[in-house]
Amino acid sequence: MKAEVIAVGSELLLGQIANTNGQFLSQQLAKAGVDVFYHSVVGDNATRLQETLEIASERSELIILTGGLGPTKDDLTKEVVASFLHKELVIDEVALEQIVSFFEKRNLPMTENNRKQALVLKEATIFQNHYGMAPGMATIHQGVTYVLLPGPPREMRPMVTEQVIPFLSSHVGDLQIISRVLRFFGIGESKLETELEDLIDGQSNPTIAPLASEGEVTLRLTVKHHDETQAALLLDETERKIRERVGHYFYGYDETSLMEKLVSCLTKTGLSLASAESLTGGLFGARITNIPGASACFLAAITTYTNDMKQSWLNVPPHVLEQHGAVSPECAIAMAQGVKKLTKADVTISFTGVAGPSPSEGKEPGTVFIGLCFRDDEPEAITLQLSGSREQIRERTLKHGCQQILNRIKRWNERSNDKV
């Protein structure tokens, strides 16, 4: 099913608000196996909306419109669509009752234009609005499905997930549509695509869709099949081929984050973790303790932003700071050793470096050193040169830290299995 999303509202064209609805709809439709080919934004103008509908109806099988269902004169989506499809607008009694009740409960006068929000296309499928007044609706005309949704995200989003997606699924046919997202870190999008070029070029069912964001790359595999079991087998086979080539960078599925994967692995292996932070300013500890179950493995996060605190809290030797500076692999190792001595954790990690925007100790922004102590192994320092804003450098540092620990756990598990 080829889909198109039309956002209606002059405030979108003027940049007064962001079109977050478009992003959300594309995400939800992709999960449902619906291909979105076009996005359009139209102001509150009947003529231009009519022209947009004429173009969309020629090239798309599903047209979703958001916004313009309110009570004012510039809310004209329903009227334009009704005229375009030669359909009558009628009052939806359920919606009207809901609107009347809203005003009565608040002891407010209801103006006549509020009744406009209860108007729907005749014989349309109605999507009740549980968080606002204007209902959504869907109608099929000459093989094209038209879906009209309210503009406010708090009204539109639950309507889509709870009512629209099930409606669309019932109209796709009896095909099972299943998606699986593979998550990778430590490899760029271009390199990943190069490694998988023949698989991506030859994709049909499942389809393979790469996406890069903040140092990570995901692959969304989507399969369509009449049998759910066979669909899963097709996904398994495609995943196997992918992981044979780039499995070293794979860490999880769907919405799993590196932090969540780390907490899961630490908990399963019974390893404890503590952190010493300078560059990241406590972000690592804050993020990991946001994850349910982190208390089973995470002991402490110590933030030492100044050299004095590094010496007094973490016992970083003065000669390390004098000879090498705080932004150095030697300091990173000393910080990791210091927090290990304090907490007795199985795994300790430290972060030091320059987030920017200015250089420090002669080091350029993006210079990062991660210290790592893993059980009784020799401590090590990992050197990174990252790019981006101050916030991006910190975020990417956290992800690299998680990856380093996960890699050490993997090697430790492999060594343990070899001894069995």
UniProtKB/Swiss-Prot annotation:
SMART domains: MoCF_biosynth (SM00852)
Name of the protein in its database record: Putative competence-damage inducible protein
Record InterPro entries: CinA, CinA-like_C, CinA_C, CinA_KH, Competence-induced_CinA, MoaB/Mog-like_dom_sf, MoaB/Mog_dom
UniProt organism field: Halalkalibacterium halodurans (strain ATCC BAA-125 / DSM 18197 / FERM 7344 / JCM 9153 / C-125) (Bacillus halodurans)
Domain of life: Bacteria
Gene3D superfamilies per UniProt: 3.30.70.2860, CinA-like, MoaB/Mog-like domain
Family annotation (SUPFAM superfamilies): CinA-like (SSF142433), Molybdenum cofactor biosynthesis proteins (SSF53218)
Family stated for the protein in its record: Belongs to the CinA family.
